[in-house]
Amino acid sequence: MQFDYIIIGAGSAGNVLATRLTEDPNTSVLLLEAGGPDYRFDFRTQMPAALAFPLQGKRYNWAYETEPEPFMNNRRMECGRGKGLGGSSLINGMCYIRGNAMDLDNWAKEPGLENWSYLDCLPYYRKAETRDVGENDYHGGDGPVSVTTSKPGVNPLFEAMIEAGVQAGYPRTDDLNGYQQEGFGPMDRTVTPQGRRASTARGYLDQAKSRPNLTIRTHAMTDHIIFDCKRAVGVEWLEGDSTIPTRATANKEVLLCAGAIASPQILQRSGVGNAELLAEFDIPLVHDLPGVGENLQDHLEMYLQYECKEPVSLYPALQWWNQPKIGAEWLFGGTGVGASNHFEAGGFIRSREEFAWPNIQYHFLPVAINYNGSNAVKEHGFQCHVGSMRSPSRGHVRIKSRDPHQHPAILFNYMSHEQDWQEFRDAIRITREIMHQPALDQYRGREISPGTECQTDEQLDEFVRNHAETAFHPCGTCKMGYDEMSVVDGEGRVHGLEGLRVVDASIMPQIITGNLNATTIMIGEKMADMIRGKEALPRSTAGYFVANGMPVRAKKMSRDLN
């Protein structure tokens, strides 16, 4: 089999490339996906409110696990990644957050990455998006990804939580993806007008899969990339339960879009990576590239949970006897509790003035439950998901064998810097201040977690060690740049090789301030133009907020806990 391009991974970026490259009818593309189809009849992936279900099994989730994390009481921690058409956009929380403009401007400070500034990237965010309330300088109106904005009146807890943030002295913003990210406001979500998950399989592949120049293979586990000297010329994969590899050749390029965990694994199995690591497994060295699998980053978060005195939380929706009605409303009308992910309000703040842009993120949820659906509190409650955004901690992904089915060694080194501990202590204390503002007085009951007895630095630190969890945002393991630990250049081309690019969240040099899916899609759109040799979209002239040393709180708190 011969194709112009072979794309490995039908995830948030791979589906973008498959769709954009096959817009040219003379370009042939093979799209390989280790998982299965995105079954539209499966409520677990299609109903926004069911977002916890895919993380509880292995049909749609690689269900990776870390090595014992040395600064987290040696816990082995979850590292869920999407498996199936749509990749992690098939199982994520559907929060559409692009990050802060200064994240991208920071990338663009690196020599060779100048065209990755916010104003260079904003046109590609807009190209990907159709926002339900209409387009403007920051949002698109004709893109493949449906973005829904929270509407007033959905749940009184959302507006109360936003108002509490304002009463605590922080700004209010009407658009976390617009002019000003800093502050509290409604959260955009990748949900269709019909109340369905807007994965990249739905948004992109639905328009491309019938094209004769696109071939899609599911249940295709990539074994390795084939090289002729220093040029990538094809891919070998295993289909289903077969142990006999299937092979295809690429006339132009192999495009690796398997994500921050799988992309470095595939490179390492293919002979690209740290020479000493590859020698351990007798893998013939194609190119010594020590940065492959290094620079692993993530967002860590905690839940601060409170009893809700008014019966307005989602607790009744967790009771089995209410779920048939919820399911029917969603299935036949695309409405009701099932049609939202319920992350409809959130915010970004600076915990200290030393940070030039927000370093703490909030997701508000009108129920007290773990992200993966476990440990639901058996009463009306609500919670804040809160965590730091740009931890200096770095980890790695390294293969354990040549077997493509064996999970790699994953170590994030969570909380390995003093900055991490200071940020999380600040986050807990600031959150308590926010939760005790007048806007929440009629709803807020007792603090369920951590509990009011948890006060000292030592007690807060122990709570973090035992209870902080991943936000499922790994990135950085094939970082873009030109230093000795970089893996790809500013166009995603792997250093020292030909015919091979990496296009996914693994190329982010530094993690962004927010959820990763929107920016991963943007990377796919921007790289698609580079691969096709098209001129970049015109640079945006939209303005954006920069704090420039402004106080972190715009005004004095309505109520001071001290």
Swiss-Prot record:
Location(s) in or outside the cell: Cell membrane
Active site, per annotation: H473
Requisite cofactors: FAD
Binding annotation for FAD: 4-33
Topology relative to the membrane: Peripheral membrane protein
Catalytic activity, as annotated: choline + A = betaine aldehyde + AH2; betaine aldehyde + NAD(+) + H2O = glycine betaine + NADH + 2 H(+)
Recorded GO MF terms: betaine-aldehyde dehydrogenase (NAD+) activity; choline dehydrogenase activity; flavin adenine dinucleotide binding
Pathway in which the depicted protein is active: Amine and polyamine biosynthesis; betaine biosynthesis via choline pathway; betaine aldehyde from choline (cytochrome c reductase route): step 1/1
Predominant localisation class: membrane
EC number: 1.1.99.1, 1.2.1.8
One annotated Gene Ontology cellular component of this protein: plasma membrane
InterPro entries membership: BetA, FAD/NAD-bd_sf, GMC_OxRdtase, GMC_OxRdtase_N, GMC_OxRtase_C
Entry's Gene Ontology BP terms: glycine betaine biosynthetic process from choline
Role description: Involved in the biosynthesis of the osmoprotectant glycine betaine. Catalyzes the oxidation of choline to betaine aldehyde and betaine aldehyde to glycine betaine at the same rate.
NCBIfam families named among the record's database cross-references: betA (TIGR01810), PRK02106.1 (NF002550)
Name of the protein: Oxygen-dependent choline dehydrogenase
